[in-house]
Amino acid sequence: MNQKQVIAERLAAILPSLEVEAIYNLLEKPKSSEMGDIAFPAFSLAKVERKAPQAIAADIVEKLDTTGFENVVATGPYVNFFLDKAAISHQVLTDVITEKDQYGKLNIGQGRNVTIDMSSPNIAKPFSVGHLRSTVIGDALANIHEKLGYKPIRINHLGDWGKQFGMLIVAYKLWGDKAAVEADPISELLKLYVRINAEAEEKPELDDEARQWFKKLEDGDPEAHELWQWFRDESLVEFNRIYDKLDVTFDSYNGEAFYNDKMDEGIQILEEKGLLQESKGAKIVDLESYNLPPALIMKTDGATLYITRDMATAMYRKRTYDFVKSIYVVGQEQINHFKQLKAVLKEMDFDWSDDMTHITFGLVTKDKKKLSTRKGNIILLEPTLDEAISRALTQIEAKNPDLENKEEVAHAVGVGAVKFYDLKTDRDNGYDFDLEAMVSFEGETGPYVQYAYARIQSILRKANFVPNAENDYKLADTESWEIIKHIQNFSAVVERAGDKFDPSLIAKYAINLAQAFNKYYAHTRILDESPERDSRLALAYATGLVLKEALRLLGVKAPEKM
């Protein structure tokens, strides 16, 4: 049990006017470590007790069961708790050594399913750094939920349907070269896509033609379907090569096209419930009671829309996976779409729509400018990852020229640097893509955390340290205590990251733990013979294990040597 919980329960036993949870939420960290580790402010009791907060604090100290604490004192209106550092450090180090990579695991999910809609690139368009966020945030959220006891189901809802295929078919029929497309599919298809969009601005009839071709595709026209299948197959080969490089896997690649024959059920339910209304020849669901614009379900030409397909998708996923959470990792520009989707499902009496959560994220820019596939202003992800690996290799060769498997380590560091930089950013904030900053071994970066882990492994190898849970490891000095508190807090950080759907909490935790250890290492001679040597090595071991696990949750590898 964490110490705040112990304090809250002890205080609740003598403060009948406050519940344990309320007390827990009032507990805070004193301004200085000299004033203790945890403080309870007595202000909130002044009205009820009709006493000055200072007097209440003194009364609490007199009545409280202080067993297991180094000291408990009243300082003005605060009750300050000094924790038993030796006892807690022993418990924390023993727990980490016993539980290993299971340390911090919780069983909140009890094995229940969580679907995570993530990555979802558009077929026939290049995989750019713009797709990186949904991919790595989704993967990290899957890892975090697994650590919390859920069963994550990673779904790559491919953008393999829509008007853009009408545009692409028109472009290919006008200017396409089969041999050129087969030689370099994505690059050639991108050129066609950019060209058709540019020309359509001058010639609106191209838009009409694209719409007609997409309608043909929906109706099963053989020529349209053959071209669509070809675009899809060629794109997936390239996407899977990039996913392998990122070390990201999926449980399902069911994209938009998969739901072509699954939309009638949702439309039928809307009709049966009298929710479908005619509006200028189109069919809509009125959402005025939700303060939302009407949801357009079917256009005048009978073509379906994203929301129709997403209704079918949600219904299929609930039926197939019986999720307790359905997470959609999709950019901020889709906020209204997901609000409408949930509202329509709610109107259909699907209460499980409350379990659907849209996880937004900010934009990636380059030189502060927005990236756009349509305008051809993008940064391709694969060559960017290769450049990150190359930069990592250059730095590794400078630091450790004799390192074995340099290429493998450079891959882990380069790819990890790009992923970590993305994930350390507050989810709803965007960031400017800066490869030099990402791959730096200094500052708040992935390589900095990886290097701290590798340094710890080097210390443990030199000492031939073998952890033993039976040993009486304990430390009571201030420097060690800072690290112990970080390690003890790991499961709480994982839980909060899951609650807030925010992997940046794990990334920041890893940075703080690495910084705390590096500071400790600079001031403490860990390998020197002393009564604390084994306990210090146990602390290094525990720090390394938790750093590695934090990085794993972010989808980042931790090399043993750098």
Curated annotation (Swiss-Prot):
Residues spanning the signal sequence: none
Compartment annotation: Cytoplasm
- What cellular component terms from Gene Ontology apply here? cytoplasm
Question: Record's InterPro entries?
Answer: Arg-tRNA-ligase, Arg-tRNA-synth_N, Arg-tRNA-synth_N_sf, ArgRS_core, DALR_anticod-bd, Rossmann-like_a/b/a_fold, tRNAsynth_Ia_anticodon-bd
Q: Which SMART domains match?
A: Arg_tRNA_synt_N, DALR_1
Top enzyme class: ligase
Kindly list the biological process annotations in GO that this record carries: arginyl-tRNA aminoacylation
Q: Where is this motif: 'HIGH' region?
A: 121-131
Pfam families linked to this entry: Arg_tRNA_synt_N, DALR_1, tRNA-synt_1d
Q: What is its EC number?
A: 6.1.1.19
Listed A to Z, the keywords are: Aminoacyl-tRNA synthetase, ATP-binding, Cytoplasm, Ligase, Nucleotide-binding, Protein biosynthesis
Disulfide linkages recorded for this protein, renumbered to the chain, are none
The domain of life for this entry's organism is: Bacteria
GO MF terms, alphabetically ordered: arginine-tRNA ligase activity; ATP binding
Reaction equation(s) it catalyzes: tRNA(Arg) + L-arginine + ATP = L-arginyl-tRNA(Arg) + AMP + diphosphate
| Record text on subunit structure and interactions | Monomer.
Similarity section: Belongs to the class-I aminoacyl-tRNA synthetase family.
Q: Could you tell me which HAMAP family the record lists for this protein? A: Arg_tRNA_synth
Q: What is this protein called?
A: Arginine--tRNA ligase
* Species this chain originates from: Streptococcus suis (strain 05ZYH33)
Task: Name the gene that codes for it.
Answer: argS
